[in-house]
Swiss-Prot record:
HAMAP family: ATP_synth_alpha_bact. Keywords: ATP synthesis, ATP-binding, Cell inner membrane, Cell membrane, CF(1), Hydrogen ion transport, Ion transport, Membrane, Nucleotide-binding, Translocase, Transport. Disulfide bonds: none annotated. The lineage of its organism: Bacteria, Pseudomonadati, Pseudomonadota, Betaproteobacteria, Burkholderiales. The record marks S373 as: Required for activity. Its EC number is 7.1.2.2. This is ATP synthase subunit alpha.
Amino acid sequence: MQLNPSEISELIKSRIQGLEASADVRNQGTVISVTDGIVRIHGLSDVMQGEMLEFPGNTFGLALNLERDSVGAVILGEYEHISEGDVVKTTGRILEVPVGPELVGRVVDALGNPIDGKGPVNAKLTDAIEKIAPGVIWRKSVSQPVQTGIKSIDAMVPIGRGQRELIIGDRQCGKTAVAIDAIINQKGKDLVCIYVAIGQKASSIMNVVRKLEETGAMEYTIVVAASASDSAAMQYLAPYAGCTMGEYFRDRGQDALIIYDDLTKQAWAYRQISLLLRRPPGREAYPGDVFYLHSRLLERAARVSEEYVEKFTNGEVKGKSGSLTALPVIETQAGDVTAFVPTNVISITDGQIFLETDLFNAGIRPAINAGVSVSRVGGAAQTKVVKKLSGGIRTDLAQYRELAAFAQFASDLDEATRKQLERGRRVTELLKQPQYQPLQVWELAVSLYAANNGYLDDLDVKQVLPFEKGLRDNLKTSHADLIKRIEDTKDLSKDDEGALRAAIESFKKSGAY
């Protein structure tokens, strides 16, 4: 086809007129220095606090320090290829992570990238990792239980949906075991679990994932892992990422449980970042805002009202309240709960479960110190049957501890004191429990009933646990209807109490334990 010169010029003119030249206006800066994952940048005049920055090689960073003539940023991931003079661009975006049901059953890093070798996550939505907690008006009081399946917790330190309950203790005294048991016990209870591992060995995280898979708990669990080999930035961000994933379910009228294991390591990572950014150190070299670091995270765990859920989902979900329950873990040094981070988190949470090394070494596991462990709001959420039966246990243990300390110095004890000591020994034995074997509500109720009504008093201490197990097995085989009634009503009626008493007495007479 031949075109004459005039047609060619017309064609070029029309193409030029139809051209839409779009310019990508972005602020640029230059890297001044790179040290230990911290970058100083000159020339980023309109950057926001917490904004994502784009570095060469598809690497991103987070702007944390905004100073007069430079910006201090932390790099997310590898930083070996970044050097002085590199160009940095603003993105105009706050850090976001993928959220949604697609993450359930997966192991991801602090940015939501899969690290379990099972392919991409394919989440349809993302959400900001830093969000403001729901206001007072949108919250509901805690009234539904989270059953951990651990006798001493469900009986004496009950946890409710939307509560923040701290698990605190020295290293190697069973903190993670308590948290994992709580996850395993949520099978079939319509509760999504999120386990955030911060600063742990990769092998330890793998063991937890393997155990969750073996027990079928990965079907409703998300694992967010920032191991000890990951950068301080990843360890600092992991809890916020996990919290955002949990909020997805809370805001849509579902229930979620999140475990931060542990926040001491997150505080260490934040201290490291802050000192490298040259922020002024305070007590124990932590920065001044380390309280806010944890308070803004834990305040996001809440039970939200039906109105909040309806407003959030634009009317799609009606009449359902959502909750996010948090179990933060704190590691103490030589039992010192008066250190900076432990006191901070104790004051933020709604109660704490103290685990003691001495109890652990004495074979009392879980090593829960009932005297100083409290649940400030969980009592309202406790199931009727457990609430009815657990009061006596706490009293028995408190009296036993007081008398045990006194009895060391007294040679001759009166009959009443001796009885209380014997009862206390048996209750302490009863509250022992093997790992990965959480109990159902009826099993806990039966154990508490037997202890309260003196059925353990004439047993040898070593016979207590075999008796309890034998009794549970006997009820399963011979009294399934009674078990079903207790499970369905979560209460113990007069008739059921009579049937239970008769069942325990006949089992005890049989001596099959």
